[in-house]
Amino acid sequence: MKKDKKYQIEAIKNKDKTLFIVYATDIYSPSEFFSKIESDLKKKKSKGDVFFDLIIPNGGKKDRYVYTSFNGEKFSSYTLNKVTKTDEYNDLSELSASFFKKNFDKINVNLLSKATSFALKKGIPI
């Protein structure tokens, strides 16, 4: 992943469907890049739920995960819904912890507290 890329997409196969996580890696929200993200997802030739991890642009856990669906061509809605289920949040947090630990040197942590930055660097789910 290039340092100047504002987001990274991870595709996870879950039984018969695909789950996508779009990690914001800079202070910009991925919603600013919806058309580019749609184009990137279309290249993956799959459809599924798309979760956005906004810990970097939000500066913390508040409203960290939001989601929509992708039908293989475009987002089903440009209105993002908050993840409110605890189990779903915890599962996403585990996946995110692994991603940020592996890619810590490529993210912008300027908006994060030292504690949050440390947790991401060490791969601790938060």
From Swiss-Prot:
Entry keyword set: Plasmid, Toxin-antitoxin system
RNA-binding found in the keyword field: no
Pfam family, one: RnlB_antitoxin
Disulphide bridges, residue numbers: none
This protein's record includes keyword Transit peptide: no
InterPro entries from the UniProt entry: RnlB/LsoB_antitoxin
Other remarks in the entry: This plasmid is only found in Sakai-derived strains of E.coli O157.
Function: Antitoxin component of a type II toxin-antitoxin (TA) system. A labile antitoxin (half-life of 5.9 minutes) that inhibits the endonuclease activity of cognate toxin LsoA but not that of non-cognate toxin RnlA.
Subunit-level organization: Can form a complex with cognate toxin LsoA.
Name of the protein described by the UniProt record: Antitoxin LsoB
Lineage: Bacteria, Pseudomonadati, Pseudomonadota, Gammaproteobacteria, Enterobacterales
